[in-house]
Design a protein with these regions (language model features):
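A cross-family phosphate/adenosyl-ligand binding-site feature
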Residues: 1-176
Length: 176
């Protein structure tokens, strides 16, 4: 694994859910690294099935994590300064808004809110799921908590997500 990290902007925890855009997670990692971020990748356990873990670890220089570390061991990642979650599923959206931290990814997102970190979220949800009342309420609550939501189903219907460049641009604005 590479040990060279560009971190002029800080340490970004990039969270990935199980949705088709997870297959292109390396595209966002490349952009973020080129933009000066040191990227650490979190994934839901199911999202790891969509991702090319060896490529992501090579690009980021850090292990991809989907499970908690062993109690009593040192953390293998540097301290987070900002977060992005893309693609974000209905399941993660509603659980996060409720403060449910039943996996590492959700735990870190809940912690990020508590720390007041800049967080950008880009849901990737098909139309039937987006019409569930819990989805809209959850987006409203997350916005009220300060999360920068990028959701444009008219221009980027699932399985598309808002372009990686727009996500990075919003992250850079939020982190200023």
């Amino acid at each position: 694994m590479s040990t060279i990290h560009s971190n002029e902007k800080g340490v970004l925890y990039y969270a990935v859910c199980a949705s088709p855009p997870a297959q292109q997670a390396q595209d966002f990692v490349r952009l973020a690294k080129e933009g000066g971020w040191d990227v650490c990748i979190l994934a839901t356990p199911r999202a790891t099935k969509f991702m090319n873990i060896p490529v992501l670890e090579q690009l980021s220089g850090h292990p991809v994590r989907s499970e908690y570390k062993t109690i009593g061991t040192a953390d293998i990642w540097p301290k987070v300064t900002a977060m992005v979650i893309a693609p974000m599923t209905l399941n993660t959206t509603t659980k996060w808004a409720q403060g449910n931290a039943d996996n590492l990814l959700l735990s870190q997102l809940c912690k990020g809110l508590g720390l007041g970190l800049p967080i950008v979220a880009a849901p990737c949800i098909t139309d039937p799921y987006s019409r569930h009342s819990a989805f809209g309420r959850s987006l409203t609550l997350l916005r009220e908590c300060g999360v920068h939501i990028l959701y444009d189903p008219d221009n980027y219907p699932a399985p598309k997500v808002v372009p990686w460049e727009q996500i990075l641009e919003r992250l850079n604005q939020a982190a200023e």
